[in-house]
Amino acid sequence: MSLAIIKLNFEVKKKLNIGTKMKSTKADIPFKKVTINGKEVAYIPGSTVKGILRTCAIRIANLLNLKVDSYSVYPSELRRNKSDIICELFGAPDKNSKIIIDDAYLDSNTEILTHVRIDDKYQVAKEGSLFKVEYLPIGSKFGCEIKCYNLSIDEMRLLLASVAEMNYERFGKAGLVEVKIGKNSQIPELYLNDSIIKEILGAMKDG
């Protein structure tokens, strides 16, 4: 079995919110939280990162001369028995994903900003429409890990190119990030010998 571990390092370039329906006493649209060693820690689900990567992969696959039949990121909208590279890499209702993405725990402090809803018809603030949103501010850093199982060369090319494309893709509620690939990534030699993969890694390497 071929296993590659790709470490992603993110820096927020435009304030970032990942909306959730969980209850919060501080914000109407908070980050998800988990308690670790008695402390509440905000995190970004790995499924969120995976969804963004899938969106990027769909958009750029043709640049790598890869055929795409599945243009949705929602499992319920995917037809069964699809075998294009998107479903092979990211999974489908009848197909396991070849990648697992860990949740990204946030070391940086979040901030809460108050907003007001605007009446689209009259372009004025709606009465009693104040709401609070929890953001990760500009300059905040976080990371996560992608475990890749038995990827073909084409699949690894597409995955790494999709990571690069994340620099231009909306992250959460209109956020933007800069993403780099960590030096401590573990990528087998069979991938490093590929010129396209080597070029992407060279451009994306952190530091």
Summary of predicted features, one role per range:
Residues 1-207:
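Small/polar/charged residue-enriched interaction surfaces, especially the RNA/DNA-contacting tracks
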